[in-house]
Amino acid sequence: MTDRWDPSIPEHKHLAHQIEIGNGIPEMRPIQKARDALVNVGFEILHEEDLAERPDEVPWYYPLEGDVFKAQTVWDIFTCWRTSSSGKFVSHHGLKLLETFGVVPKGTWDVCETLKIAGDALVKTGQQKLFTPMYLVISKKPLEG
């Protein structure tokens, strides 16, 4: 979670929880904890950057938004459509039908619903810059001397 994430704000905490549940992550931690951990074990941080903050016309979460107009390639059109309202409707109801007839294992639809929660939370936190999958840190461990 970025430095903008504040666990005292209920919406922020709820969105982090949705990411945790949907992606099987035990606990989302803020970037500051990563910084502190590096320093505590003796690393010197040479450079750190949230690459998602760089100016780009298309955000990292675009495939999860469901906006086919942000597609970068022909295959992206299908990828983006799957997360659109109509794509979610077709895929989730189609999957429920396949599960009903035993084509896919029981519980597949439930997993899909959980992933949908995570995807929606990733989009919201990406738009609000509360979460980043693109935190870059370059550090070095000083030589003992």
Predicted regions mapped to residue ranges:
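Conserved beta-strand signature within the Rossmann-like core of class I S-adenosyl-L-methionine
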Residues: 1-4
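Substrate-binding/catalytic lobe of Class I Rossmann-like enzymes that use SAM or dcSAM, i.e.
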Residues: 8-134, 138-145
